[in-house]
Each structure stands twice: as structure tokens, then as C-alpha cells.
Amino acid sequence: MIRITSRSVKGAVNIRSVSTSTVRFNNAPKVVSPPVPPTVKPQGSEIPPPPPPPPKTKKFSLFGFLFKTTLLATVVYGGTLYAATKNDKVMDFVIDKQLPFHEELIDFIENGSTEDLEEAWENLKSKFTNVKLPTKDDIDELTQKLEHRGEDIIKETKKKIASTHIGHKSGTDLTPAEQLQRGVEIESVKKDFAHLPLIELNSDLGKSVDDTVKQTITSFNNFIQSIDASSLANKDDKLVASVNTSVNQLASRLNSLTKDFDNELQKKLKVSQTELFSSFTRKELELTENLLHQFSTEKQQLESKLNQKLNQEIQAARAAISQAASNAVAMVRIEQTKNFEKLVSEKLNEERTGRLANLEKLNDRIIELEKFAEGFETQIVSNHKKAIIHQTVSKLKSLLLAPTAGDKPQPIKPYLDELTKIASDDEVLKLAIKDLSPLVTNESTHSILTNAQLLSRWEQLAPELRSASLLPPNAGLLGHLASIVFSKLLLPVKGIKEDGKDIESVIGRVESSLARGELDIAVEEAANLKGWSRKLANDWVVEGRKRLEIEFLLGLIESESRII
């Protein structure tokens, strides 16, 4: 009876170990946090405020440090290469130190643009878009498949183990009455247990299998070892072998997929490497062509500069040689001229002492005669001009100032043209003729009034002046009639009143001045009239002033002609 009890207890322990291992393999244990006791605040006492939290110290970030360091290095490196394109000393430093990728970056800074950068980015992007790497979802899906298959295998194993124990009950499954009625069973205790085979991968697959698959295989092996540790009677080696075969197939499949992926990746990388190498080769050829073009351009420029400098030096040498030769020839000519002059002077001295003794006196007399002839000719010309000017002026005076009644009217313009030709060298005469021309251009010999004509017109104008002087301001028809009547009653004033300002005194002074030939005084008296009387006398004043101006200009021309 003691044997049975021990066996039943041992079987229960083994079953508990299998069930606990299964639960441990499938489900993780839950962690239950202990209950927090409620806080009790003491009454009647004030709790001091909690101290302020300490300032949070900024933790050191390795990623931030690396990012800032990389950014600073990039800025410094790019700034150095950009400065190298502007400064020759920095360029020499970059070339001497052989900074990495300095040639490509300097060429991109000098000749590159945003379009080139976008094109390079698109090319690089298109090269790597065709390479398809396994995503995390694919790996997780494969891992889940393996785990589900392992769980199915575990479930099948449990079913087979349970089916072996359905046929008989252990001592622990019987009631106490059944145990007393049942006879004593003697069982042989087996000390040697055959262990289930563990899942192992082939040697060629062990190195290339993914870590997730290895972890799954390890979980299966742990489960198999837990089964070995239990006291289950019949163990299905075929099931474990099938699991082992399935896992090996999965591992080989995964290995083949990994190899295919590696081969595809290597092909893509080779294609990318070939394209990059071809692009680098093309860029190298372009740079070589650019350098050769620049070299040829610089060579042509240097050759042109050297040829230009050589031509300038040759021209300067030719000019110097020709100048030296011309100087030498000039010196020879000067020397020959001096010798010739010396010979001529000796001959002249010999002749002077002989037949040409009075040659200098004769030359002086000839020069004096030339000067006298020139002066005499000038005097004759000036006298001729004077005579013509006198004749023209006299003719103009006789025609304009004292015309005879029987003469026909003649134009004045021909006489002015003749004066203009003669007086082209004298400024005063030119100005006088210029002022005289507009006065007499449209006039004839009878259009200029004489003193007698001016006096006659003034006498005709006097009655109108008397009547106009009697008109009140803003006079109407009655005022005009009254002024005409009262002007008839006025008595003429005899004699001259120097200080009189009435109209009779002015008329008397004008008539007296015209009788004496003092036209300027008469015009001045008439010009000083006011009001309606001045308007009536305006035409007479204009004619008088025209005669005065003509007389003055003719007198100026005559006076100037006398001093030419």
C-alpha cells in the first residue's frame, strides 16, 4: 500500500510539472502590484508645503553630441572648400593635405547647381528602389508562423500523451473504498528512461539561420527536455522527428530565401557599382576635357600675349633703330649745311667787298618803298570809302530830310546796301546801319515828314487838342459837343510861356520850337501831354521821333566816316 501511494504521488508531481511547464511556455506570469495603503492626514496640524523639486539636469545625449559634431565638421569642411575656390593659399593647403573628396566638392561648388544635385539624388534613389529588403513585418510573420506551428505540435503531443493514460487510472484517481477493495499491484520500477531526440539543424544551415528561428528551436528543445523530465509512459519519437524535420525544412527554406536575397542584393550592388564607376569615369573624362580646354585656352592666351609683347619689342627696336638712323642722317645734313653756309658766306663776303657793297642799302630802301606803298594804298582805300560814305550820306540826307517837291519818290534800300558793303570793317558803322535799316526799309524819299510838314500837321492838330482838353472825364455826346463849342471861344495865346501847363501854352511852345528847327524839344513837349490829348498827338510824336532817329543815325555815320 505504501508503494501505491508513493507511485501515485510521483505521478501527480510529474503531471503537475508538465502542466506548469506548458503554462510557463505559453503564458507569462502576471505581476500584481501590492495595494497602496490610504494616507491619513493628522487633524489639527498643518502640513508644511513640499519643497520645490530640484531642477532637472539636462542629460547627456550621445545622439545630440554626434549630430552637432557632424554638423560643425560639415560646415567647417564646406567653408574651407568654398574659401579654397576664392583664395589660392587655401587651395594650396587643401591640395597639399589631400582632403577627402576635395576635387569633387570643389568642382561641384564651382560648376554645380541645384539641378545637378537633384539629378544625382534621383539617380541614387532609383538605384536603391529596386533592391527590396525584407521588412520587419515579413520577419514577424515568419516568426509567428513558426510559433503557431510549434504550438500545434505541442497540442498534438499533449493529445497523444493524454490518450495513453485514458485506458487505466492511477492510484490517485480511485476513491478510498476502491483503493481498499483493490489488491496490491506490484510494478517494476524502470530506472533507465529513453530521452526524446532534440531538434538540431544541419551543419550547413546552423550558421545562416536567423536568430528568431534559433530562439524558436531552443524553445522546442526546452519543451522536449521538460517532457523527458516527466514520467509519461509512452513517448512518441515519430512526432518529435516530424517536428525536427519540419523545423529543418523551415530553416532550409529560410536559408534559401536569405541566400536568394543576398544574391539579389549583390547583383543590385554590382549594377550600382558599375553605374557609379561609369558615372565617375564620365565625370573624369569631362574634367579631363575641361582641363585640356582650359590648358589650351591659357596656352593660346599666353602665346597671344607673348606674341603681342614680342611685336611691341620689335616695333620699339625698329623705331629706335630708325630714329638713330634718322638722327645720324640729320647730323650729316646739318654738317653739310653748315659747311655749305660757311662756303656761301665766304663767297658773299667776297662779293660784298666787290660789286655788292651797296646791296644792304638798296634792300633797306626797297623795304621803305614797300611800306610807303602799303600805307599809301591803305590811305587811298580809306579816302575812297570816306568819299563814298559822304556821298551816300549826303544823298540820303537830301532825299530824306530835304526832298524837293518835283522829284519822284525813290526807294532807300539801295543806298543802305551800299553803306553796308563799305562799312563791313567798322563796328560802329555796322551798328548804326543796322539800327537805320528797319526805320527806312519800307520808306521812300517822300514818306519822311520834313519840319514844315510836321509844323503844318501840328497846326491842323491844334483845334482837336483844344477841344480834347475841354472834355470832362467819361464824357458823352453832350460833352463832346460842348467841348467843340467852347474850343471856338478860346483865344489863341501870343508869346511863349515857359512854365505854362495849359494846352495853349504847350501848343505855343511846340510851334515856336518847330519854327526854330528844334524838333527834339517840340517832340518832347508833345510827348508830355496827358489823357485824350496825348492819344490824339501820338501819330505826330511817332513821325517826329522817326525823323529825329534818322537824323541822329545819319549824323553818327557821317561823323564816324571822318575818323576812319
UniProtKB/Swiss-Prot annotation:
<feature type="coiled-coil region">
    <location>
        <begin position="281"/>
        <end position="380"/>
    </location>
</feature>
<comment type="similarity">
    <text>Belongs to the MICOS complex subunit Mic60 family.</text>
</comment>
<feature type="transmembrane region" description="Helical">
    <location>
        <begin position="62"/>
        <end position="84"/>
    </location>
</feature>
<dbReference type="InterPro" id="IPR019133">
    <property type="entry name" value="MIC60"/>
</dbReference>
<keyword id="KW-0472">Membrane</keyword>
<dbReference type="GO" id="GO:0042407">
    <property type="term" value="P:cristae formation"/>
</dbReference>
<keyword id="KW-0496">Mitochondrion</keyword>
<feature type="topological domain" description="Mitochondrial intermembrane">
    <location>
        <begin position="85"/>
        <end position="564"/>
    </location>
</feature>
<protein>
    <recommendedName>
        <fullName>MICOS complex subunit MIC60</fullName>
    </recommendedName>
</protein>
<feature type="region of interest" description="Disordered">
    <location>
        <begin position="27"/>
        <end position="55"/>
    </location>
</feature>
<comment type="subunit">
    <text>Component of the mitochondrial contact site and cristae organizing system (MICOS) complex.</text>
</comment>
<keyword id="KW-0999">Mitochondrion inner membrane</keyword>
<keyword id="KW-0175">Coiled coil</keyword>
<dbReference type="GO" id="GO:0061617">
    <property type="term" value="C:MICOS complex"/>
</dbReference>
<keyword id="KW-1133">Transmembrane helix</keyword>
<keyword id="KW-0812">Transmembrane</keyword>
<dbReference type="Pfam" id="PF09731">
    <property type="entry name" value="Mitofilin"/>
</dbReference>
<feature type="topological domain" description="Mitochondrial matrix">
    <location>
        <begin position="18"/>
        <end position="61"/>
    </location>
</feature>
<feature type="transit peptide" description="Mitochondrion">
    <location>
        <begin position="1"/>
        <end position="17"/>
    </location>
</feature>
<comment type="function">
    <text>Component of the MICOS complex, a large protein complex of the mitochondrial inner membrane that plays crucial roles in the maintenance of crista junctions, inner membrane architecture, and formation of contact sites to the outer membrane. Plays a role in keeping cristae membranes connected to the inner boundary membrane. Also promotes protein import via the mitochondrial intermembrane space assembly (MIA) pathway.</text>
</comment>
<keyword id="KW-0809">Transit peptide</keyword>
